[in-house]
Amino acid sequence: MSKPPSDPPRRPPAAFAYEDEASEPRNSGRQQQGRRKPESFSENIVVTPDEDDPFINPDSDLIAPPVATPRKRRTSFGKIAAGAFGILLSLGLGLWTDRLIRDLFTRADWLGYAALGVLAIGILAVLALVIRETAGMMRLAAVQTIKAEAEAAILETRPAKARAVLARLTTLLAANPETSKGRATLKATEGEVIDPPHLMALAERELLAPLDRKARALIVNASKRVSIVTAVSPRAVVDLLYVLYEAVRLIRAMAELYGGRPGTLGMFRLLRDVLAHLAVTGSIAVGDSLVQQVLGHGLASKLSARLGEGVINGLMTARIGIAAMDLCRPLAFRTLKRPGIGDFIADLTPSMSPRGNNP
């Protein structure tokens, strides 16, 4: 009778040391020997937050210009003095006209009647001019009123006030054919229940999006013209005069685009508001951020100094256009993105931008 096969002898359990575990004490000993001694630091050290660190957030240097707002109208002693002397000069002009007409009547009746006819035509022309300027000022005031009422209507819970603001906005932009599609879309939503914030966002997308695209094209074209003229003009006076001409032309085109259509006095007031905003924010001078934007695209090494001046003047013209856009736009930027200076660098320097280098 054969015996069953016996199991092979089992190896007793043993512990093994891995290479990492074996080297750990040695490495820890080296680390302990290589540690530096604690030191004290000065209390004047300021830690820069991550959101302000230009190496972590390189786009933080491209600071968007602040939103332009119209200046508050205040009564000053200069305005009172100008009004008083204006009334005095008007009385003197009236007395001179009366004496002139009397003298003409003493010479011949037909001369007196002719002078009266000329005076009547002049008075009618002045009245028409006053009416036109007053209408232009009222249109500019209506734009700011709609903007303020829209901001207040967003905070309401009922859409009645937002609907009223939307009706005024539609009336303001009714003469612009580019808003016809948006007006039809908004008219189709009259029977629907929409919250005021969503209603104003819909109005901004449907009515102002095509106008914003055209406004951006106006700013780009004006900036390009200023850049070219600055690069080829022989005198700095020519640069200054042309920049002023393009600024006035751009501000007027921006006001007419958004339904303002200012007159002569309204244009002066709008120009004063834009220049006051640029002077307060320091946008007239070439600041560090603007220089960084230009030099960051390699213009210092790839362009001549004259062409670099043209690009800087073009960027300043773009800032004027952005400020005019803020003042003339009947709704504040909420749903749509507000343009910044960085959006126009690629248009002024296409060969230096990644978009221009792509085939």
Swiss-Prot record:
Protein name (Swiss-Prot/TrEMBL): UPF0283 membrane protein RHECIAT_CH0002430
Membrane topology classification: Multi-pass membrane protein
UniProt entry keywords in alphabetical sequence: Cell inner membrane, Cell membrane, Membrane, Transmembrane, Transmembrane helix
Source taxonomy: Bacteria, Pseudomonadati, Pseudomonadota, Alphaproteobacteria, Hyphomicrobiales
Record bears the keyword Lipid biosynthesis: no
Coiled-coil portions: none
Region of interest (Disordered), residue spans: 1-50
Parts of the chain that traverse the membrane: 77-97, 111-131
Species in which this protein is naturally found: Rhizobium etli (strain CIAT 652)
Family: Belongs to the UPF0283 family.
InterPro entries (UniProt xref): DUF697 (IPR021147), UPF0283 (IPR006507)
GO CC field: plasma membrane
Location within or outside the cell: Cell inner membrane
